[in-house]
Amino acid sequence: MRANFVDTVMARLDGEVATIWATVLLRLEDRPDVALLRRGLRALVRESERLNVAWNDARRAWVPAVRGDVEVDAVLVEGAEPLSEPDAVARIINTRVDLSRDVPLRLHLHPMVDAAQGPWLLGIQLHHAIGDAKALAHLLERLWLLCAGRGSESRPLEPSTLTDGKVLLAALRQPGRVLGLASPRRRLLAQRGMGLRRSGDTAGHALLATARLTLPQGDTDLQASEVFFSALLAGVALRESPADGRIRLRMPVDLRRMLGLGRTLGNGCSAVPIELSLKEVRARLEAPRELARFLRSEVQRVLDEGVHWTTALECMAVARLVPARVLRKNARPGLIAEPRTNTLVVTYLGRMDTHFTEAPFRIRSMRSHTATWGATGLSFADTLNINTAAFQGLWTREELRDFTERVAGWASSGFGLRAEVLAP
């Protein structure tokens, strides 16, 4: 199975800094039926061609690797010892995998010490080389149906149909998208973003914290995604020194929708750099909705210019032409370069409720994580969860907590939202 340019970059970089999982973390009301989950997982893996592959780095391709029931049963890891949520989360998000051998899917079930928040934690992970968070959401919808014996109600997810060729043809329809590679402002790898102050120069275990904000009912003018992005901008502006600089967000853009490719199991995103002056962000800190509008207009400008096609070409060139040793050699230095290629990698996953309506358990709360220095956001029930991520050795737990508290405090006071922070 041919790997597209996103698969290739993710597989070739995997493990250099961390295992690149797309992770959701669920606090549950009761212990789920493990036998039911394992039956569903067996059926899911049997029908999913893309879960029956292994990465061949020499060929830069997926090769067939049919999974037996024993291998699939090992996907669900049960913990016996009650853990605190920070300890369980740290164990889950730092799980390693070998793409040349292992099933690229993991479920972790842990009993919790602080049972009042939900006595069980279920972590679900899909390796980003196989699919992104959107693909994981679709995969889980399918898993819930298989667990309920209702697999015939929908079709199995097909492997990704996003190919390098389709992206190349779409990009070439407007020559300016190719010429845009000459502009550093339109390149993901251009070192233009201000780096965040850090306490060290090594990237160790992944860290996660969450700002949980209660969304108001009926405020149709307040979009959760805009709260997410503007609160992160504010967190940077409040934390960093007063000197001017560029805040550079790296933000994914879904190409599947633009190319009409539908629901598949795979990677379907390009990414765009969103550059904003720190001075201009600071000037709007007392006017949160104005900051949200300012950010919205900048994102729209970048999309109107087709920068997502330019950066897709850039990523394609890196995936196909750059030797693996060069990719891996530059992964860690890129985190501490000054200026950096990005200040934060940020992803808003959208409203997640619809993907879990058929889940065979009751969910108390939800968080997410991607192994990066940045943040993922999601809405679930009446909450917006801003999940901030970093690495030990760059930030301490206290630094991550401080940044997350600044994000939560600004969003709470600016938009009138009740906030709490979960941090290691």
Feature locations, PLM:
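Hydrophobic/aromatic-lined pockets within catalytic cores
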Residues: 131, 144-148, 232-241, 300
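A generic structural signal for alpha-helix starts
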Residues: 31-32, 130-134, 219, 223, ...
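Non-catalytic, low-complexity flexible loops and terminal extensions
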Residues: 1-8, 12, 130-216, 406, ...
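Acyl-thioester-dependent condensation/acyltransferase catalytic cores
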Residues: 38-125, 129-137, 141-151
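Extracellular and analogous surface-interaction loops
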Residues: 26-31, 213-219
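Alpha-helical scaffolds flanking conserved acidic
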Residues: 119-124, 225, 246-247
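Acyl-thioester-dependent acyl-group transfer interface
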Residues: 1-61, 82-105, 237-424
